[in-house]
């Protein structure tokens, strides 16, 4: 299945000069959505994953069904002020400054093998901050999976030696 057939391209959104890749049509098509989830589940199967971690918001959309299919838990990564219990945080650079991500301080147990799942790998800032928090909690990042990679933004360089899977390249 060619998943790119289910990605809408919106020029100059959210600002002039940006090409936005919208996964909404993929999610709206049960066959395409299921296919994408199964591809990530297949990638994860041999990695002995204990926990899926997904950054808000579209990491939830992709990561939760993967966790469900694998029969394991899901831990959310959120912006500050969105999680009710004790959190840890990591900063990451954005185009115009610094932003922060958080996760519950007890989300990952030492030694747990974690797969990070998100919709998009762009500059790599989100995944870098997520990796930092998982490792601070003693987790092992066994891999990363993305629906889309924007190749020209070089997020792959931020991932470095971590194993990863991408379903579509732009």
UniProtKB/Swiss-Prot annotation:
It is an enzyme of class 2 (transferase). Pathway: Purine metabolism; AMP biosynthesis via salvage pathway; AMP from adenine: step 1/1. GO terms for biological process: adenine salvage; AMP salvage; purine ribonucleoside salvage. Signal peptide: none annotated. Pfam families: Pribosyltran (PF00156). It comes from Streptococcus sanguinis (strain SK36). GO terms for molecular function: adenine binding; adenine phosphoribosyltransferase activity; AMP binding. It catalyses: AMP + diphosphate = 5-phospho-alpha-D-ribose 1-diphosphate + adenine. It is found in: Cytoplasm. GO terms for cellular component: cytoplasm. This is Adenine phosphoribosyltransferase. InterPro entries: Ade_phspho_trans, PRibTrfase_dom, PRTase-like, UPRTase/APRTase. It comes from the Bacteria. Keywords: Cytoplasm, Glycosyltransferase, Purine salvage, Transferase. Homodimer. The gene is apt.
């Amino acid at each position: 299945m060619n998943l790119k057939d289910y990605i809408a391209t919106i020029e100059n959104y959210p600002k002039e000069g940006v090409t936005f890749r919208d996964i909404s049509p993929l999610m709206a098509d049960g066959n395409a959505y299921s296919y994408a989830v199964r591809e990530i589940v297949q990638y994860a199967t041999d990695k002995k994953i204990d926990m899926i971690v997904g950054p808000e918001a579209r990491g939830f959309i992709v990561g939760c069904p993967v966790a469900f299919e694998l029969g394991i838990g899901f831990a959310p990564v959120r912006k500050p002020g969105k999680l009710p219990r004790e959190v840890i945080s990591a900063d990451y650079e954005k185009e115009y400054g610094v932003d922060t991500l958080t996760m519950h301080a007890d989300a990952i147990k030492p030694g747990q093998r974690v797969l990070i799942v998100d919709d998009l790998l762009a500059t790599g800032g989100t995944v870098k901050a997520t990796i930092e928090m998982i490792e601070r909690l003693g987790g092992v990042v066994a891999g990363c999976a993305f629906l889309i990679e924007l190749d020209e933004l070089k997020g792959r360089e931020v991932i470095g030696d971590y194993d990863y899977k991408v379903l579509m390249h732009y």
